[in-house]
UniProtKB/Swiss-Prot annotation:
Organism per entry: Vibrio cholerae serotype O1 (strain ATCC 39315 / El Tor Inaba N16961)
Lineage, uppermost ranks: Bacteria, Pseudomonadati, Pseudomonadota, Gammaproteobacteria, Vibrionales
GO terms, molecular function: chorismate lyase activity
PANTHER family: CHORISMATE PYRUVATE-LYASE
UniProt main location, coarse: cytoplasm
Residues that bind substrate: 82, 120, 165
EC class (word): lyase
Designated name of the protein: Probable chorismate pyruvate-lyase
Source organism, top-level taxon: Bacteria
Length: 179
């Protein structure tokens, strides 16, 4: 695990998760991004010429590595851990941390273990039966400044996954003007 990945994971572990109604959003644009119910990947793609993914981790993990919070949102079983950095025009915008229970990977139209450098949101939101719940947002102080984060449970064909996103300093979510 490289130093930046460690920094991002440590930041996510320090986020105080809140319900969207309980947080003061820094700007309407940030609120729109954090409360996005559709594909964040699609939203990001509209803000740049080239949206790319750097795959940091894509491996099956044991259930005992889940945090308490994660076990409250997902079944305690083996899961696929997918960690990525999503870039817009070669600028790091989002660190993504996704947990997909093994049972959620069965009978799906896609093989998530082979997702590779394709943004997960593009795959998930191309399915017919997708919904988001348990949306939480928060701030975290890092060496790179104060960063926003969100996590939510996505249901694809009635099977859950937990998606957590840390919005990096160069992300358009922090733009002063509407992008």
């Amino acid at each position: 695990m490289n130093q930046l990945t460690s920094l991002y994971l440590a930041a996510l572990n320090r986020v105080t998760w809140q319900q969207p109604d309980d947080i003061e959003f820094p700007a309407p644009l940030a609120q729109q991004w954090l409360l996005e119910q559709g594909s964040l990947s699609r939203r990001m793609a509209t803000q740049c010429e080239h949206l790319t993914v750097d795959l940091l981790s894509n491996q099956i993990m044991l259930a005992d590595t889940l945090s308490y919070d994660e076990t409250q949102l997902l079944a305690s079983e083996e899961y696929l851990l997918r960690q990525v950095i999503i870039y817009g025009d070669q600028q790091p915008w989002v660190f993504g941390h996704t947990l997909i229970p093994r049972s959620s990977m069965h009978n799906q139209p896609f093989d998530f273990t082979q997702q590779g450098k394709i943004p997960l949101g593009l795959t998930v939101f191309s399915a017919d039966n997708v919904k988001r719940d348990a949306l939480q947002v928060g701030w975290v102080e890092t060496e790179l400044g104060r960063l926003l984060a969100r996590r939510s449970r996505l249901w694809m064909n009635n099977k859950p996954m937990l998606v957590t996103e840390l919005f990096l300093a160069t992300s358009p979510i922090y733009s002063k003007e509407r992008v």
